[in-house]
Amino acid sequence: MPTIQQLIRSSRKKITKKTKSPALKMCPQRRGVCSRVYTTTPKKPNSALRKVARIKLTSGFEVTAYIPGIGHNLQEHSVVLIRGGRVKDLPGVRYHIIRGTLDTSAVKDRIRSRSKYGVSK
């Protein structure tokens, strides 16, 4: 317990919450342009070829974002919308691309969880 004199000398510090998606700059989504679309492998014990894209955002950041769903139409210079949300088995991937917006197509033949993949009825 600090004394009153110690509290007068220096007040209590507020605990600042560190954001998990700094490139969004406190916005729900951000627009960006794909600079590279490629596949990468997850860390152990998983095995796959995960589709990811390197994106230059309007906020000035360059980030790696995951492309969800089966099949995509993204290529270099595609304009995409990203949201926060990491991929647990891909280190450094802290953002998701939103399907069905801007240049990103919706997932073809999707029946369940359609809203997450930009599919209309």
From Swiss-Prot:
Which Gene Ontology terms describe the biological processes this protein takes part in?
translation
Q: List the disulfide bonds.
A: none
Q: Which UniProt keywords apply?
A: Chloroplast, Plastid, Ribonucleoprotein, Ribosomal protein, RNA-binding, rRNA-binding
The cross-references to InterPro entries, in alphabetical order and at most eight, read: NA-bd_OB-fold (IPR012340), Ribosomal_uS12 (IPR006032), Ribosomal_uS12_bac (IPR005679)
Provide the protein's localization.
Plastid, Chloroplast
Any GO CC annotation of this UniProt entry: small ribosomal subunit
One of the record's GO molecular function terms: structural constituent of ribosome
Record keyword Chloroplast present: yes
Per the record, the major location class is plastid
| UniProt keyword annotation of Ribonucleoprotein present | yes
SUPFAM superfamilies per the UniProt record, alphabetical = Nucleic acid-binding proteins
Instruction: Tell me which PROSITE patterns the record gives.
Output: RIBOSOMAL_S12
The protein's role, per its UniProt record: With S4 and S5 plays an important role in translational accuracy. Located at the interface of the 30S and 50S subunits.
Family statement drawn from the similarity comment of this UniProt entry: Belongs to the universal ribosomal protein uS12 family.
Note the subunit structure. Part of the 30S ribosomal subunit.
Designated name of the protein:
Small ribosomal subunit protein uS12c
Lineage of the species this protein comes from:
Eukaryota, Sar, Rhizaria, Cercozoa, Chlorarachniophyceae
